[in-house]
């Protein structure tokens, strides 16, 4: 019996999701893989960077994403005339941190105004956004709060493939931990992109959409029960989860222009 003939090899990047109008991947490496040829990239970090970003942009605040919270971030903030978000414990009840509630409090008490600038460090969503911006692709910061607004804006504003990147979290040792809250957020955005006419979806994008549809009405419960939600609750910040679960309450689209996010 003769052995099967080997098919002629094809020349295609198996990771780029070329040929699909809606793409989906994880983290910085995934963002790099699917951004080539994309007309826009949407970054999702539900707990908490893009949720906090949406709260800030709703209030008219200009937000500078930054990779780490260290001396370089402080210098960067000073040269931009911006406030630097600090750690949650350092912020306590009065400072501004990565917590969306801290931004709401600061807006309510006048610490942050519509003319304010805020440097918001995050090893996840901010890092992905800055990397993509350095590559010259338009970047949108989306969460559950503004998923439909971001998707609709992207479909209207660009012609070509749209990539959605779930930022994910990190395991000890610096390896990516895919986080289900970002999968759900990406899935909602992909669902909204499809409803607005974008497509076709890559298999990975379709899987993310199915994950969001699968959680359905149990989304808020799922956010509280997932690993990232439990981490926040264990540290005493479980009340932030309700802000992340405010589905499609915002019509503002955070667009990264140069170094900072502003409402599109």
Set out the residue ranges of the language-model regions:
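Active/ligand-binding-proximal structured segments within catalytic/core domains
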Residues: 40-52
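Long, charged alpha-helical interface segments
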Residues: 95-138, 157, 176-264
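Residues that scaffold, gate, or flank divalent-cation-dependent active/transport sites
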Residues: 23-35, 49-64, 70-118, 125-126, ...
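Catalytic cores of nucleophile-dependent amide-cleaving enzymes
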Residues: 133, 143-172
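Short glycine- and acidic-rich boundary segments immediately preceding or forming the N-terminal edge
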Residues: 1-22
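Short beta-strand segments
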Residues: 43-44, 85-87, 120-122, 142, ...
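Extracytoplasmic/secreted cell-surface and envelope-processing proteins
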Residues: 51, 172-175
